[in-house]
Regions:
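Intrinsically disordered, low-complexity Pro/Gly/Ser/Thr-rich segments with frequent PxxP/GP/PP motifs
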Residues: 80-100, 175-206, 282-289
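Short acidic, flexible loop segments centered on an aromatic residue
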Residues: 155-179, 265-286
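Short beta-strand/loop motifs in extracellular/secreted proteins, especially
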Residues: 63, 74-77, 154, 164-169, ...
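Helix-biased "structured C-terminal domain" signature
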Residues: 86-98, 192, 235-237, 247-249, ...
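Short, aromatic- and glycine-rich surface loops/edge beta-strands on solvent-exposed regions
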Residues: 98-118, 203-213
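Extracytoplasmic/periplasmic/luminal assembly and interaction segments
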Residues: 56-98
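Short, surface-exposed polybasic-aromatic patches that bind anionic ligands, especially phosphate groups
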Residues: 182, 194-197, 201-203, 207-208, ...
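Conserved functional hotspot residues at active sites or interaction interfaces
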Residues: 2-64, 115-159, 216-268
Length: 289
């Protein structure tokens, strides 16, 4: 056993010696790394684009009996508030069919811009102030305040401010089910679509729209009448996306002639749900379920 151990030890020592000789004869390879170079990179900020839906769309001509006739009446004034704190009120800044406004960024920051449009409408069949904010074009959105019954007229103002054609899918949700329609919009095209051409005598409806690839501007114009008397006009932008919690800021009505405010709720899901409404007034709090 001692002899065998000595033989194994001798072989191991010889192998170690030979490995040292081979290692010593191998060329030495050195690795070098490039010295890092610091460079300043400037990122061009994306411009902020807003779109104003434009002036009042009159359906059926001034008399209301001209089939298929839709005219944009007058001009809507545009007011801008810049991120620098400057308010721009230019009497020459108006639009009829809609306008795209762009705020170019600076110092790697997107420019800030807030824009509204307003128009006083005075026609035989329409009277009132039509005003709204100007929003960013969107790929999809909701409206839940639609009305298309007797004495109520709703017109969709569709605009494609992009450089590509798109297909807009409209889904009207009425108490009896769903009604769909598709509208093709070329680049830069604006179209006024009377809702009465799609649905008929629906006092309450919701609308979901979605495009095939580029964002568009959609606004809902409403006109109300009582017999031969006009009751007012309105212009609305898409509602906020469905959420668990929503906050609606209060209003102070300082003039007679307005109808009482109505809260409209819409459950877009397939399961029933319960809504808890907390109304806060100056002197009390009311909770409804």
């Amino acid at each position: 056993m001692k002899l065998a151990a000595r033989i194994v030890l001798a072989i191991a020592l010889v192998g170690l010696f030979l490995s040292q000789i081979v290692t010593a004869q191998l060329p030495v390879v050195s690795t070098s790394f490039a010295t890092p170079v610091l460079k300043d990179v400037a990122v061009e900020p994306l411009p902020l684009e807003l779109y104003c839906p434009g002036a009042f769309a009159e359906v059926g001509g001034e008399s209301g009996i001209e089939l298929g006739q839709i005219d944009r009446i007058g001009e809507a004034s545009i007011y801008q508030f810049l991120g620098t704190g400057e308010l721009i009120v230019d009497s020459g800044l108006t639009t009829t069919t809609g306008a795209r406004l762009v705020a170019v960024g600076d110092n790697q920051s997107t420019g800030l811009l807030s824009v509204i449009q307003s128009q006083g409408v005075s026609r035989d069949r329409a009277l009132g102030l039509m005003a709204s904010a100007c929003s960013q074009p969107a790929f999809s959105g909701w409206f839940i305040s639609g009305a298309a019954a007797l004495g109520q007229e709703t017109v969709l103002l569709l605009s494609n401010p992009s450089e590509s054609e798109t297909l807009v899918s409209l889904e009207f949700l009425v108490p009896g089910g769903k009604i769909t329609k598709q509208v093709s919009l070329a680049a830069g095209q604006t179209e006024a679509l009377p809702v009465s051409s799609v649905i008929f005598q629906e006092p309450v409806f919701a609308l979901w729209f979605e495009t095939s690839g580029v964002p568009i501007s959609v606004a809902m114009q409403q006109r109300a009448t009582a017999g031969l008397s006009t009751r007012g006009v309105d212009l609305q932008l898409p509602s906020p996306a469905p959420a668990v919690d929503n906050l609606i800021t209060g209003l102070s009505v300082r003039s007679e002639g307005f109808e009482k405010p109505v809260l409209r709720l819409f459950n877009f899901g397939d399961a029933a749900t319960e809504a808890v409404i907390t109304a806060v007034a100056s002197n009390n709090v009311l909770v409804l379920r």
